[in-house]
Amino acid sequence: MGTLVFKDSITKEIVTWKHIQSEKVEDYKYLKDELLKQGYTIQSVVLDGKRGLYKAFDNIPKQMCHFHQKKIIQRYITMNPKLEASKDLKKIMTRLTQTNEKNFTEKLNNWYEKYKLFLDEKTISNTTGKLQYTHPRIRSAYRSLRTNLPYLFTHKNYKNLVINNTTNSLEGGVFSHMKNMISLHRGLTKNMKLKLVDYYLINYYKK
């Protein structure tokens, strides 16, 4: 059980939320449509890269959270990569917040050209006896960057909209306090916890 929360990055208000069993794209679409019905104008969204989520916000400028993107890459190549390809990719990632789309894309393209043959290497699996990619994790890291690339620099391409490049105002500003509050009331039933979350979110902006 979790809670999906939409926050206005300009007014800092929690505008809507929904308790969910698991995170689904349909839930995002539902909340988006609810906001539109209430007369809100959605100028942009900052997302964490969940698969299929970009389609839920068609025709709305979308920014991929830099913090989540870095965490995704870190999960695949670790914090202390051993492979040269991984080390070089990590160097590119360290410039994500300082660079622009043109330079970042150029660096990523050059990296791919340099390591293309390495990425395409295959070996025979000891378990299945079939050919498989030798370096699947770094391939996944590259694929994540390539997929999210069109959304990594929206905050710079739409400067007039003043878009955040992370979801930190939710992660640290809302969820961390909410989790602490729930942990202090571990003995509550699920329904009581949901009511506690509702109360917290209703009164969030009034604090």
Predicted segment positions?
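Hydrophobic positions within alpha-helical membrane elements
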Residues: 13, 53, 73, 176-177
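RNase H-like nuclease fold core
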Residues: 1-44, 51, 55, 148-151
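A broad structural signal for alpha-helix termini and local helix breaks/kinks
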Residues: 39, 57-61, 182
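Conserved beta-strand -> loop -> alpha-helix junction used to position metal-binding or nucleic-acid-contacting
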Residues: 44-91
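Short, function-defining helix-loop hinge/capping sites that tune catalysis or transport
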Residues: 16, 56, 76, 179-180
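A generic membrane alpha-helix/interface feature
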Residues: 26, 66, 86, 189-190, ...
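Acidic/histidine-rich catalytic cores and adjacent linkers
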Residues: 40-51, 91-207
